[in-house]
């Protein structure tokens, strides 16, 4: 089993990272492999609802100029996904919101039950 931990904090080794590291440590104790991916300050454009991802049929966003397709590829290889983010005005970080919108639109069906 493999779990992908997504760090949506702009602070690379802040509180969110610390919490995800503890989760990774506990998973390792259980014999579960994990990987932490940091998207905090990496460029992520918002979804423009062009629909090209559904026309392509490859579970990828047509815009391949940021971290979105990389994360989708990692998510395909995992059995579970854990997302960590600071909370700003009751929401996750902006980068994480954009990432979630695009990856769920482009490849949402393959993430069912993860």
Predicted regions located by residue number:
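A short beta-strand-loop structural module common to alpha/beta enzyme folds
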Residues: 32-43
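Short, glycine/charged-enriched secondary-structure capping and boundary segments
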Residues: 18-21, 50-52, 95-99
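N-terminal beta1-alpha1 ligand-phosphate binding loop
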Residues: 2-32
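Short amphipathic alpha-helices and their capping/turn segments at secondary-structure boundaries
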Residues: 25, 35, 70-73
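Helix-loop-strand module that forms the ligand-binding subsite of alpha/beta enzymes
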Residues: 62-114
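Cysteine-cluster motifs in flexible loop/terminal segments that predominantly coordinate metals
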Residues: 42-75
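Glycine/Thr-rich phosphate-binding loops of Rossmann-like dinucleotide-binding domains
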Residues: 14, 57, 91
């Amino acid at each position: 089993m493999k779990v992908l931990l997504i760090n949506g904090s702009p602070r690379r080794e802040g509180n969110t990272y610390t919490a995800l590291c503890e989760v990774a440590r506990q998973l390792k104790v259980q014999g579960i492999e994990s990987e932490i991916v940091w998207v905090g300050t990496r460029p992520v454009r918002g979804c423009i609802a062009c629909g090209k991802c559904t026309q392509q049929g490859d579970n990828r966003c047509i815009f391949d100029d940021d971290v979105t397709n990389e994360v989708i590829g990692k998510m395909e290889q995992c059995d579970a996904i854990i997302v960590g983010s600071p909370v700003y005005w009751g929401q996750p970080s902006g980068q994480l919101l954009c990432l979630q919108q695009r990856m769920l639109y482009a490849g949402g069906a393959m993430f069912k039950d993860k």
